Amino acid sequence: MKPLPSEADPGYPDSAMQKIVIAIDGYSSCGKSTTAKAVAAELGYAYIDTGAMYRGVTLYLLEHDIAFTDLPRIEQALHEMQISFKRNRQTGRNELCLDGKIREDEIRQMRISNSVSEVSGLPAVRHAMVRQQQQMGHKRGVVMDGRDIGTTVFPDAEVKIFMTADTHTRALRRQEELAVKNELVELADIIDNLEKRDHIDSTRAESPLRRAPDAVLLDTSHMTIDEQVDFVLERASAALFAPAAGSSERNGG
């Protein structure tokens, strides 16, 4: 990864004065979370995996036998459940906590993947999660990835990236992720899951997956993670330095 300018460099934006929001949207298994985590670490920003939050809601509903059509019970559940993140000091990852318990491994299972798009499309769920996400990032200095960050959660984000990749590449990546956790799934089943989720996410009435008009398209089909991270960091650097450059020019510098 290419390093950003150091704080010793003249003109480095004062971290206490200037913070931005980096919104990374796109399809599942394009490398959003891995890229977003690395970018956040490089900038010293908070990282929020909004997809994990919807997976947490899905897990809660399944474990409490709440039908996805039972809207009154879902609204009650949203008031009862507590979703937060806890940093794992050994791995450096932010892990999802549901009612105070780390549930990171459970929310990544295929049974959750098969239902999360349906749950995340429910208006009550969407509204509750968007409110919480906006509260988490209201001080800025955050990298957030999901489906509607640049269009709904933070439409004023200074950096917007929309990630995509071909379905076969995405399926291979997801299969590798699951295999690491000893969950062996046929590639055809993963492709079917991705295609169904793409359709649901893109056609739902509430905050559909779409590229914001001012988002930069990033096809990660043939890119390494380092290349993806550098791509985002370059745009973050431009956003951070643009106001400073403008101020310098106005002052005759």
Language-model segments: residues:
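ATP-binding Walker
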Residues: 30
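NTP-dependent small-molecule kinase module
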Residues: 97-104, 172-181, 200, 204-253
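N-terminal phosphate/diphosphate-binding loop that engages ATP/GTP or pyrophosphate donors
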Residues: 42-107
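Hydrophobic anchor at the beta1->P-loop junction of P-loop NTPases
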Residues: 24
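ATP-dependent NMP and nucleoside kinases share a basic, alpha-helical "lid"
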Residues: 104-181
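Small-molecule kinase domains that catalyze NTP-dependent phosphoryl transfer to phosphate-bearing small molecules
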Residues: 88, 133-140, 147-152, 156, ...
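Walker A/P-loop
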Residues: 33
